[in-house]
Curated annotation (Swiss-Prot):
Superkingdom per UniProt: Eukaryota
GO MF annotations, alphabetized: D-dopachrome decarboxylase activity; phenylpyruvate tautomerase activity
The EC number(s) this enzyme carries: 4.1.1.84
Assembly information from the UniProt record: Homotrimer.
Catalytic activity: D-dopachrome + H(+) = 5,6-dihydroxyindole + CO2
Any GO CC annotation of this UniProt entry: cytoplasm
BP GO annotations: melanin biosynthetic process
Primary residence: cytoplasm
Originating organism: Xenopus laevis (African clawed frog)
Enzyme class: lyase
Localization per record: Cytoplasm
Keywords: Acetylation, Cytoplasm, Lyase, Melanin biosynthesis
Modified residues (N-acetylproline): 2
Name of the protein this chain belongs to: D-dopachrome decarboxylase-B
């Protein structure tokens, strides 16, 4: 059950209207998870500084069970997420940051329990 959070200082009108849907589909493909299990949040107009500059930028946090736990996995995922974000947002790669957060099943609650028991 991946959780993907995109923060950007771009304004709402500067990002594709269907960015959350596209990011959901891209995440499912990149991580090899069913689209129905992907959770996406997109926040625009956020006050952000990357590399000492408030020029247009974005940060993507990818949290998931089992598929973001190694450098090798994340290197492959990183290239694909960077391609998606540069294409969708028109940002240079040096204005994009990714953060991979491995999760354990007991850290995600759903249906009154945690994923460990589902």
């Amino acid at each position: 059950m991946p959780f993907v959070e995109l923060d950007t200082n771009l304004q709402q009108q500067e990002v594709p209207q269907d960015l959350a849907e596209k990011l959901c589909s891209a995440t499912a493909t990149i991580l090899g998870k069913p689209r129905e299990r992907v959770n996406v949040t997109v926040r625009t107009g956020v006050s952000m500084v990357v590399g000492g500059s408030s020029a247009p930028c974005t940060q993507l946090i990818i949290s998931s069970i089992g598929v973001v736990g190694t450098a090798e996995q994340n290197k492959e995922h990183s290239a694909k997420f960077f391609n998606f974000l540069t294409e969708q947002l028109g940002l240079a790669q040096d204005r994009i940051l990714l953060r991979f957060v491995p999760l354990e099943p007991w850290q995600i609650g759903k249906n009154g329990t945690v994923m460990t028991f589902l």
